[in-house]
Regions:
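A short, structure-level motif marking secondary-structure boundaries and short turns
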Residues: 54, 83-84, 116-119, 147-148, ...
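Structural microenvironment flanking redox-active thiols in thiol-disulfide oxidoreductases
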Residues: 74-105, 109-137
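C-terminal cap of thioredoxin/glutaredoxin-like
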Residues: 3, 139-227
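Solvent-exposed loop/turn segments at secondary-structure junctions
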Residues: 56-60, 87-91, 117-122, 152-155, ...
Length: 227
């Protein structure tokens, strides 16, 4: 009997400890994530929209991208991912136009990582229209078609909408990720004891925000800020 009582007490303590640990790992408002005010209407329909705000010119985005690609392979099935390039300075406009032109030509998957490497490993200055057009031609893309799309009103309009979207979401840095038009976070918000980005924990926060948007009871208290 004594053994059973001790075992029962141990189980209760274990459950309490696990519950406390789980609660401690819930994302904290204004620390691990922020609210989008006012909430924005996603473009994903029934699925939960997850947006990465990025720039090919951003070295942190280049470093973050391999971990993002790993997460994309295991992301929840009801999460629909898309990328939105930011233009925080004039030199970022050409890389933003490059992204949308690659998207229009169906070449993002093939050349996405190559753009990052060209800028951040090979020190290619892809910050002017001509530099981008010449680089694209060297990657085997039809130069005339690329240039026509790159300089089109449609691509300019997409860049303008991307900039407006970033402002509406309150995005202040890249990389950042938004969930469901209601929450946004970034690796620089989810840090370890030394102040470095905790990427495993960051993607856990993204998963939890997706769960919150989905409305799972387990995530109901996640939006409460700790006192």
């Amino acid at each position: 009997m004594r053994f059973l009582r001790l075992f029962g007490s141990f189980c209760l303590l274990l459950v309490a400890a696990l519950s406390a640990a789980a609660q401690a790992q819930q994302p904290v408002l204004d620390k691990d994530y922020k609210l989008v005010t006012p909430p924005q209407k996603p473009e994903s329909g029934k699925n939960i929209e997850v947006v990465e705000f990025f720039s090919y010119a951003c070295p942190h985005c280049a470093d973050f991208d391999p971990d993002l690609q790993v997460w994309l392979k295991r992301k929840p099935k009801d999460a629909e991912f898309r990328m939105v390039p930011m233009v925080f300075r004039e030199s970022w406009k050409a890389p933003a136009k490059l992204f949308y032109t690659l998207e229009a030509m169906g070449a993002v998957e093939k050349l996405h990582r190559k753009v990052y490497d060209a800028i951040h490993k090979e020190n290619q200055q892809l910050f002017t229209d001509q530099a981008v057009i010449d680089w694209a031609a060297k990657q085997g893309l039809d130069k005339a078609k690329f240039e026509q799309l790159y300089n089109s009103f449609g691509i300019d309009a997409k860049v303008q909408r991307a900039v407006a979207m970033g402002r509406a979401y309150g995005v202040q840095f890249t990389p950042a990720m938004a969930v469901g038009g209601r929450y946004w976070t970034g690796p620089s918000m989810v840090v370890n004891a030394s102040g470095a980005a905790d990427l495993p924990r960051f993607f856990q926060v993204v998963d939890q925000l997706i769960a919150m948007e989905r409305g799972k009871p387990a995530a109901a208290s996640a939006g409460k800020k700790k006192g």
